[in-house]
């Protein structure tokens, strides 16, 4: 139980800016981190929905509310995944050979493609969030989106080949196996079912679309880069949540 509690706090401190007790790195606890990744999604989702609830009670104008709500998951994660999105976008959009793309991915310099990509992402995501609010949809969906995205993301991390000597391969993949994969996929399926029975078919479509786009992106990244790492995982997660918001605005 102590190891599990330590794993929760390690996961919180690693993937969010939410204050939590600090622990020395523990390999026994580390093998549970990916299984707990969806739990981080639950916390982020609950705070995401809470931000909507508070802003709506304050009668904040919809356009401003959309902008503020949009920033919540990025702020809670310290822009960790958005950074990965920018790095991978820079590499993939360069249209260079595989070796050059990998070199660009490792380069800390902010490239033009990464800037263009993040600006377009946030503009379209803002439009999607504004539309969702304008349609008076059930915003409890904000709780489920981060759980679903992290369940699939965690599954990819424990099941897919890593790029080089990735820190993810060392810290998260070691000690995991088929049981972890089944648990993470099971959580995604459970979230989809709960979404359907509590919110309805349109919300389920958004959750399923997130899963579909994640596998499409995985195939693309594996083809062009050869595997995944932390940046790639962040890239996929950001676009999964983007897809969820966009689909809710469209359907």
UniProtKB/Swiss-Prot annotation:
This protein's pathway: Cofactor biosynthesis; adenosylcobalamin biosynthesis; adenosylcobalamin from cob(II)yrinate a,c-diamide: step 7/7
Compartmental location: Cell membrane
Purpose of the protein: Joins adenosylcobinamide-GDP and alpha-ribazole to generate adenosylcobalamin (Ado-cobalamin). Also synthesizes adenosylcobalamin 5'-phosphate from adenosylcobinamide-GDP and alpha-ribazole 5'-phosphate.
Species whose genome carries this gene: Clostridium perfringens (strain 13 / Type A)
Protein name, entry field: Adenosylcobinamide-GDP ribazoletransferase
Swiss-Prot/TrEMBL catalytic activity: alpha-ribazole + adenosylcob(III)inamide-GDP = adenosylcob(III)alamin + GMP + H(+); alpha-ribazole 5'-phosphate + adenosylcob(III)inamide-GDP = adenosylcob(III)alamin 5'-phosphate + GMP + H(+)
Entry's family note: Belongs to the CobS family.
Enzyme class: transferase
């Amino acid at each position: 139980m102590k190891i599990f509690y330590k794993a929760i706090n390690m996961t919180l401190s690693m993937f969010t800016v939410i204050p939590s007790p600090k622990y020395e790195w523990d390999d026994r606890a580390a093998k549970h981190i990916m299984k707990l990744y969806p739990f981080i999604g639950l916390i982020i989702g609950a705070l995401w929905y809470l931000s909507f609830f508070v802003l709506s009670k304050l009668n904040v104008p919809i356009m401003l509310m959309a902008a503020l709500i949009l920033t919540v998951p990025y702020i809670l994660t310290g822009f960790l995944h958005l950074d990965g999105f920018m790095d991978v976008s820079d590499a993939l959009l360069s249209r260079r050979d595989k070796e050059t793309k990998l070199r660009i991915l490792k380069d800390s310099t902010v490239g033009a493609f990464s800037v263009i990509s993040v600006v377009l992402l946030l503009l379209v995501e803002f439009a999607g969030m504004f539309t969702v609010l304008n349609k008076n949809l059930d915003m409890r969906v904000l709780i489920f989106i981060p759980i679903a995205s992290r369940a699939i993301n965690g599954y990819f991390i424990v099941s897919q080949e890593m790029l080089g000597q990735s820190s993810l391969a060392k810290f998260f993949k070691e000690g995991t196996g088929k049981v972890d994969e089944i648990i993470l996929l099971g959580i995604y399926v459970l979230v989809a079912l709960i979404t359907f029975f509590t919110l309805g078919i349109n919300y389920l479509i958004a959750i399923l679309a997130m899963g579909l786009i994640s596998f499409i992106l995985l195939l693309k990244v594996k083809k062009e880069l050869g595997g995944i790492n932390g940046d790639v995982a962040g890239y996929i997660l950001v676009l999964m949540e983007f897809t969820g918001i966009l689909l809710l605005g469209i359907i």
